[in-house]
């Protein structure tokens, strides 16, 4: 789920924190990708006649097809992906996981009703909501990525928090996920829509945490409290508090503690035994692997093993897989060129000189003529 309404809130209150880009603009960038989120997307999106793709043995292959081809697309555009997999969910997430299971069961009932009525649109709609990612899907995804030469990181807990840790450690440029709580975990740069199919023509949204904090005029702790008020995976929020009011309350009272002390109990319902402090600590000090000594390596794909796994075991086309392997090898050759900005450090002095030069150029253009009028050029 992530954080309810955070993307729109940032667009409304801190628009300078968002920009849109084409995938080619990330050439040479290393990106930590929320693997579980991506695999779940592929299970929902990569389908045939409304059903997940399967091989002759009836095994699901949507996740493998999506992972293989979308990863190749990123690599062809010069991106170096690192896939981060979820570990054990935190105790605070148990309520959210139970709600998700209830929603899946309800969707299953609605899908069955749609089948009885022959309603194709609703069959597809509700069937997608019943999709569940299994440990087997994740293990197969890891195997595929390693054979492709793409680094895999196993998070001890939440993948988004591990991605954020990699960004903070300078190991990667950004976190690639659809879950906005990557920002709440402290990822300074977050990319949405990175693993979407090219056919959807969705620009990549790039969020900058630092800009959001500056424009909102919030500290990181206040931003986390805002996210808890909006609604997160780890606890309920105060009933009656929407995004606009949440911003106003943080601006006025600065913390959830003071909000709870001052708001009207007649207007707003604060959850009993509300574990917002535990949720706050989870965002501030998540369970992650230390990244400082972590070595991320992109290696040559193992063509023979990929053919064995995807063709012999999973029923993919050998010609397509071998062409994919060729694309990976070619992409590795071009991505090693790196980005131009990785060779230089832009200092504040350099920025100031550039600004001063622009001012001087502006003065020259605006030089008045003898009669006090501006010269035409």
Swiss-Prot record:
Primary residence: nucleus
Record's protein name: Flap endonuclease 1
SUPFAM superfamilies the record matches: 5' to 3' exonuclease, C-terminal subdomain, PIN domain-like
Superkingdom, natural source: Eukaryota
EC number(s) stated in the UniProt entry for this protein: 3.1.-.-
SMART domains: HhH2, XPGI, XPGN
Post-translational changes noted in the entry: Phosphorylated. Phosphorylation upon DNA damage induces relocalization to the nuclear plasma.
Residues annotated as binding Mg(2+) 1: 34, 86, 158, 160
Ranges of Basic residues composition bias in the record: 361-377
PROSITE patterns named among the record's database cross-references: XPG_1, XPG_2
Keywords in alphabetical order: DNA damage, DNA repair, DNA replication, Endonuclease, Exonuclease, Hydrolase, Magnesium, Metal-binding, Mitochondrion, Nuclease, Nucleus, Phosphoprotein
Subcellular location: Nucleus, Nucleolus; Nucleus, Nucleoplasm; Mitochondrion
Oligomeric form and interacting partners: Interacts with PCNA. Three molecules of FEN1 bind to one PCNA trimer with each molecule binding to one PCNA monomer. PCNA stimulates the nuclease activity without altering cleavage specificity.
């Amino acid at each position: 789920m992530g954080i309810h309404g955070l993307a729109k809130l940032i667009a409304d209150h801190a628009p300078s924190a968002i920009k849109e880009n084409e995938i080619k603009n990330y050439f040479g960038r290393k990106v930590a990708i929320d693997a579980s989120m991506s695999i779940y997307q592929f299970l929902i999106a990569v389908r045939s006649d409304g059903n997940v793709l399967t091989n002759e043995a009836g095994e699901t292959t949507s996740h493998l097809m999506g992972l293989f081809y979308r990863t190749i697309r990123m690599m062809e555009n010069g991106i170096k992906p690192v896939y981060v997999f979820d570990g054990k969910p935190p105790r605070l997430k148990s309520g959210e996981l139970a709600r998700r299971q209830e929603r899946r069961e309800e969707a299953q009932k609605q899908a069955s009703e749609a089948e009885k009525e022959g309603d194709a649109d609703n069959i597809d709609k509700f069937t997608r909501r019943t999709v569940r990612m299994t440990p087997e899907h994740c293990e197969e995804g890891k195997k595929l990525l390693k054979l492709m030469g793409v680094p895999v990181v196993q998070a001890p807990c939440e993948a988004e928090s591990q991605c954020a840790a990699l960004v903070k450690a300078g190991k990667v440029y950004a976190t690639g996920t659809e879950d906005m709580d990557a920002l709440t975990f402290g990822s300074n740069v977050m990319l949405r829509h990175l693993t979407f199919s090219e056919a959807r023509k969705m620009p990549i949204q790039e969020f900058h945490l630092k800009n959001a904090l500056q424009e909102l005029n919030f500290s990181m702790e206040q931003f986390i409290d805002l996210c808890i008020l909006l609604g997160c995976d780890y606890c309920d929020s105060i009933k009656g508090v929407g995004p606009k009011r949440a911003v106003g309350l943080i601006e006025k009272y600065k913390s959830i503690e003071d909000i709870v002390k001052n708001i009207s109990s007649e207007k707003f319902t604060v959850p009993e035994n509300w574990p917002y402090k535990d949720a706050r600590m989870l965002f501030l000090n998540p369970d992650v692997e230390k990244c400082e000594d972590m070595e991320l390596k992109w290696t040559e794909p193992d063509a023979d093993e990929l053919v064995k796994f995807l063709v012999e075991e999973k029923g993919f086309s050998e010609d397509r897989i071998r062409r994919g392997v060729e694309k990976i090898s070619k992409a590795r050759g071009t991505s090693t060129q790196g980005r131009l900005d990785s060779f230089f450090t832009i200092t504040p002095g350099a920025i100031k000189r550039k600004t001063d030069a622009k001012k001087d150029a502006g003065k020259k253009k605006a030089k008045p003529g003898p009669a006090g009028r501006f010269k035409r050029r």
